[in-house]
């Protein structure tokens, strides 16, 4: 099952009181591929994302990264190991510039307590931050405060902040939430470019976007894995069409 998986979830379950959000979820995420997690509302996508990203402790099962059991490790330790994430809700420093936000993230990698050291004490960080901002399309917005960026630009900045930790694995939770169609196209093109050099796991509810850029797709339903495979395999899966797409062939066509 695992092959050259960089991350695996093994028999993961999660309960909240009497409610079972995840049940025996086992998924292997291939190294160097873009894997998307989809499913209808209430499928358990966000809960699963929070478990594999270290924000939630599973009630059962474990999460393994590069052969190491990382279940229960702090998010700081996960970042040190090479896992970075970006959530639906931005967590930027709104009054700091785009460059300062990314520079601080890069500085935090150098030392756990080094976020506020003088910039001069950590040579090269400004250049590194500038390069990351250019990579995500914000090379002309270095001096703009995060609060002054458009929503799509803020999401791109979030991704640059995540990349500042030099991750082996990038986890993205609904990066297009609240975006205009133009912003959505831009951010998905960015993610597709990033995935050519990194392993990316993407939670996204927009089927068309997922099918167009993913190498593999995992479908969750009622907290369980309903199906997984290539986009074409998911399009052709009758169970997926029944519980998620809802309208058979026309819905699959729209997902292309």
List the model feature ranges, each with a label.
Residues 2-256:
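Glycine-rich phosphate-binding loops of nucleotide-dependent enzymes
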């Amino acid at each position: 099952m695992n092959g050259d998986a960089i991350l695996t979830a093994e028999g993961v379950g999660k309960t909240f009181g009497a409610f079972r959000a995840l049940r025996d979820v086992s998924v292997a995420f291939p190294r160097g591929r873009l894997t998307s997690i989809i499913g209808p509302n209430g499928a358990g996508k966000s809960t699963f994302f929070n478990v594999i990203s270290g924000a939630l402790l599973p009630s059962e099962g474990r999460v393994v990264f590069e052969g190491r059991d990382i279940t229960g490790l702090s998010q700081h330790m996960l970042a040190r190991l090479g896992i970075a994430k970006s959530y639906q809700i931005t967590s930027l420093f709104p009054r700091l510039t785009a460059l300062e936000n990314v520079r601080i993230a890069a500085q935090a990698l150098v030392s756990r307590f080094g976020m506020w050291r003088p910039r001069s004490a950590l040579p090269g960080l400004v250049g590194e931050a500038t390069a990351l901002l250019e990579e995500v399309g914000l090379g002309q917005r270095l001096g703009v405060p995060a609060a002054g960026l458009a929503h799509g630009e803020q999401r791109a900045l979030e991704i640059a902040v995540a990349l500042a930790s030099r991750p082996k694995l990038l986890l993205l939770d609904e990066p297009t939430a609240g975006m205009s169609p133009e912003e959505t196209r831009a951010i998905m093109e960015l993610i597709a470019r990033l995935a050519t050099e990194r392993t990316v796991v993407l939670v996204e509810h927009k089927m068309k976007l997922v099918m167009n850029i993913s190498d593999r797709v995992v479908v969750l339903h009622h907290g369980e894995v309903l199906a997984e495979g290539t986009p074409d395999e998911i399009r052709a899966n009758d169970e997926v069409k029944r519980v998620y797409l809802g309208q058979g062939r026309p819905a699959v066509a729209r997902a292309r």
